[in-house]
């Protein structure tokens, strides 16, 4: 006999525990590498258009889920909530790329791209950067939606419209998320000052924490009830698998993009070509924030209330 399903609060903690039970031993093992191997590249163009082709890592899941998995099962996703999430998050991603790409990243291997520049503060960046953000948000959301609506549908909220109508207001301050964010940023600053690379400020990590936790600070008490935590956890693991393959084995070793040392917190993984810890955490933040935004918009749509009443409560 199975017991009752875990509460939304416990489910959130279980997801953290699942991440930790993999991250902790992996981190300990990677830390034992004191003399990492160095990749020797004999040619000047080892990966022609490599960055461009690698975008298929997001494009293929988008096509398979959007044009095969969902239609073949006759699943109807909440279109307005889905596209509103995309139209909110993608411009934010583009904005971050425009303002911070040249501050946080470098692109040493121009031959791995199409050679088409896209505008950004401080100089053009490869157009692949903007495609990366657009397809990234779309892939994350489609994977979560498919898992929630089909593969792990038994674990979602059974009577979503009824539950949504009982929510008095969507906007609810979550102090714990704010405290976690402040502690994480303070810890990153402190770590950098005592690391081997004390110069600069952990700007990239700070942006990731703020971007990932703004939805949580504003909406987590409401969203927690509606998130399909099993679908969320599998989404994170799938995206992290794609990201680690992408960055640790291809992008950083072959110079598709790199990270500006002064803007990182100073924790680099030598066994993964010096990959900063920020590269591991970025997709956790993206998946977390995307899921909360989508569920909040989905609850609003299901409630049938005007935006002002749904988000701020009835007058």
What are these regions (language model features)?
Residues 2-315:
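Aromatic-rich, lipid-facing transmembrane alpha helices and their immediate juxtamembrane interface loops
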């Amino acid at each position: 006999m199975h017991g009752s399903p875990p509460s939304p609060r416990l489910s959130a903690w279980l997801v953290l525990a699942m991440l930790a039970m993999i991250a902790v031993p992996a981190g300990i093992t990677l830390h034992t590498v004191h003399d990492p191997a160095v990749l020797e590249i004999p040619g000047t163009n080892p990966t022609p258009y490599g960055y461009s082709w690698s975008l298929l890592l997001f494009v293929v899941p988008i096509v398979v889920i959007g044009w095969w998995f969902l239609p073949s099962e006759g699943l109807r996703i909440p279109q307005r909530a889905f596209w509103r999430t995309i139209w909110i998050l993608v411009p934010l991603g583009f904005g971050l790329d425009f303002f911070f790409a040249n501050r946080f990243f470098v692109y040493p291997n121009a031959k791995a791209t199409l050679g088409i520049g896209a505008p950004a503060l401080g100089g053009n960046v490869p157009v692949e950067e903007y495609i990366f953000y657009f397809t990234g948000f779309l892939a994350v959301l489609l994977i979560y939606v498919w898992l929630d609506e089909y593969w792990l549908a038994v674990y979602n909220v059974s009577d979503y419209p009824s539950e949504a109508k009982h929510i008095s207001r969507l906007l609810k301050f979550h102090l714990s998320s704010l405290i976690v964010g402040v502690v994480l940023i303070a810890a990153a600053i402190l770590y950098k000052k005592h690391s081997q690379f004390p110069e600069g400020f952990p700007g990239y990590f700070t942006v990731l924490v703020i971007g990932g936790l703004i939805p949580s600070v504003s909406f987590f008490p409401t969203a927690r009830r509606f998130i399909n935590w099993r679908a969320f956890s599998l989404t994170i693991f799938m995206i992290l698998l794609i990201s680690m393959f992408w960055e640790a084995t291809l992008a950083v070793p072959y110079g598709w993009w790199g990270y500006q040392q002064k803007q990182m917190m100073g924790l680099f993984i030598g066994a993964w070509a010096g990959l900063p810890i920020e590269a591991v955490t970025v997709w956790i933040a993206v998946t977390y924030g995307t899921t909360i935004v989508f569920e909040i918009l989905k609850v609003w749509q299901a409630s049938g209330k005007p935006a002002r009443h749904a988000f701020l409560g009835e007058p």
